Amino acid sequence: MTQPLKALRTRAANLEDAVAIAEIYNQGIADRVATFETEPRTPAQIAEWFKAGHLIMIAEADGTGAVAFAAAFPHSSRPCYAGIGEFSVYVARAHRGHRAGRAVLSALVEAATGRGFHKLVSRVFPENAASRVLLNRLGFEEIGTHRRHGQLDGVWRDCVIVERLLEHGGAPDL
């Protein structure tokens, strides 16, 4: 079993974290295992997330700075979907498998519950086993699959849909 990082802590991200968040996100984009995005993001683009009021948490470890982030944003601008957040989680390559993803997603769930979110939803590539295991352990349910939902490098990809209701008790006991 992989050992957890020592001195891992989570906190709400701020604008000063935009560079680190962009670096982590760009690793995920390059690896092609967690997003349909193909173009690297700049810190200025990440800064727009803060200006839009997105909920962003980071995990820091052993004085290395941010090693993971989780972000939630409105699922839709339509009023009927108010309170539903769509989220993403990314972990720096060197820190994958060390529970940073678990820590930062747990912090996001807690913060989203505190902000009054009703539900969190996301999409995961079917072969992303690590994400699927993490999501299951944190109380997310796989509720279906979007078939050929988007193209990545010219190939139509499926996405597993996950969700977690937050209104009945918040974060699970870990």
Model-identified regions with their sequence ranges:
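Conserved catalytic-core motifs of GNAT/GCN5-like acyltransferases
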Residues: 71-74, 79, 121-124, 136, ...
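Conserved GNAT acetyl-CoA-binding A-motif
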Residues: 112-124
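Conserved beta-strand-loop-alpha-helix junction that forms the acyl-donor binding cleft
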Residues: 96, 122-132
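Conserved acetyl-CoA-binding loop-helix of GNAT-fold acetyltransferases
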Residues: 97-111, 132-137
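A short beta-loop-alpha structural element at the N-terminal edge
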Residues: 8-21
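Acetyl-CoA-dependent GNAT
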Residues: 38-94, 105, 111, 165-167
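Conserved G/P- and acidic residue-centered "switch" motifs that form tight phosphate/ATP-binding loops
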Residues: 99, 128, 154
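Conserved GNAT-fold acetyl-CoA-binding loop/helix
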Residues: 18, 22-48
